[in-house]
């Protein structure tokens, strides 16, 4: 399985009318991952590679630039256990937490999924990667796999087993004089590289308990000059002249990595078992056994690995301080910008700014004490707002919902335990609403839980006050508050979640844990509770006709149809105004989707986590098996993305939101955020500023041409300078796409072409020019 690195060449057309975010081709992907919690580092000459638990990047020492390395660049996975670079073969190995592997040779990425996909039971983790000439030694939870760089093949898999047949874990290996030394959970073993039956573990010799090396797990192994070093417990042993002797030991100092070059053996150590560590240090051991200790409790907080480059600079992976360099007593820190966490619960875009609520709840809707605060992505830069520097958030955790006021810069975040936060982006102010505004949960007096948020057409903020005696709260547009008890069934325990508001101002409220949907309408008299319309929707004709009461998400489309995501696919309320009539006219229906000649209920076998509506009224659906684009009426599956057919970083898509200006679709997954630039944007009221990208269209560009800033569903006509129409289409929301071909399917010739766009009733027109450049 091969993938090839590609370089995305951005074609920049000098025009002040283009916003930076529009200079992205249709169909391109961009990951948004955290880069600050480093766990592995590898020196590669001019480059240093650094891995976090969720991402990989390189740092260029010559120009101080970063390159983010992830699925859009051809890498196979996210979630990294470790990396290793071999200067002799110029090979980078990326070992993932799911046992997948990528080998990077120059500009080629070779995926090796066979450990991941194997039927091996038990631990398949890859704990260490070592090189010996053309051979890569992969130390795994079951033993060792050998891989040859030149042939791209594995000549042998060695299963390490004890007397009972249970697998032994290989922690690492080194090759000296054609002899493999493997550190395992049961001690040190050795075998000749050219042993014809190397896969037979009985051919391996046990070295623990002999020549001074004690019996027990060997956690690390390394060669420095002519000596072999092994770590047993807290002690580093050295093997010279046929004897193992204790070399270095201090109680409670745990060696976590060994590295060597021509000058030093480098030992990375942590003191104690706390997180962050009580202390960390790096030991430099020279050829005369002189030990230099580097300690800095500010910079070294949870040390993972240290390597040394040819210039004598130490490059350090630290969980709390990202990639560090150390030289002449000075530390420097390096990391590309990214979100502070990979976690996502809810997202929204307002005025081209992405807001993320990264809190957590479990399947039983219990809070998880997540203190990641909230995240903001504005003009290409991520910012985090949490307890560090924001004392107002000291008692706030688990932001799981977010709503934005489209009129201004106000954004509301709902905490599942810490109340409601009002954030003004422009003023950079925060205001917290808890006691006196929201009700606590009986039996949990300090917990003010917000399960969902939604603004109605008159800008009243509706709040799911989860578990409260009055589970619906309203912050009215004038700033006053109300609390409402809709009389939910006893077994619901007033547990309320996501809220959406339809065009009738009806509130559709998720009832978690298999309790259906609450619909509530104040009947245009918000202060008069006596005339309110209330109904709980569930199974049965006239009662909602839900095919399952396990409702995960809700969405209102542009035709005021209510799309409901459940544990068993999607159902739709086509006539939401009829839900109070107790007739089948207001019931939900499962749409039938055409799957290439046969029909079935839409995503009936999928757990649907989220639904988002784009500018063309199509639905982006996030499930536990990937992301789908569904047609406006739900009868066609237009796109399906998963980890096997796209750069999507995980099949578990928890939340989707869309930037209506750019067409960016943000997928929030259980492994982080990735964005996809697609064809539909929101239409504008007046199409006074039409953008075309790319423009000019250069000869080597073969992608689609985007025309955005249009009125919704505008008719678009493209003509040559003689006025002849060569292509005509309708905008998807506020954006039209053109493949650069005429009606006859051939590429448009070099020249200037006119774009004429007219809205649906003909009252608005817009004009733009496109320069096509070909090699003809």
Please identify what each model-predicted range represents.
Residues 571, 652-683:
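Blade-level signature of beta-propeller repeat domains, shared across WD40, Kelch, NHL, RCC1
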Residues 22-44, 70-87, 113-132, 157-176, ...:
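Short coil-to-beta transitions that initiate beta-strands within beta-rich domains
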Residues 47-50, 91-94, 135-138, 179-182, ...:
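Conserved beta-propeller blade signature
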Residues 715-726, 753:
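Short, glycine-anchored, charge-dense loop/turn motifs used at functional sites
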Residues 71, 731-764:
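Short, surface-exposed loop/turn motifs with a glycine/proline- and acidic-biased composition
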Residues 108-109, 149-152, 193-199, 380-382, ...:
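Short loop/turn segments immediately following beta-strands, especially the blade-tip
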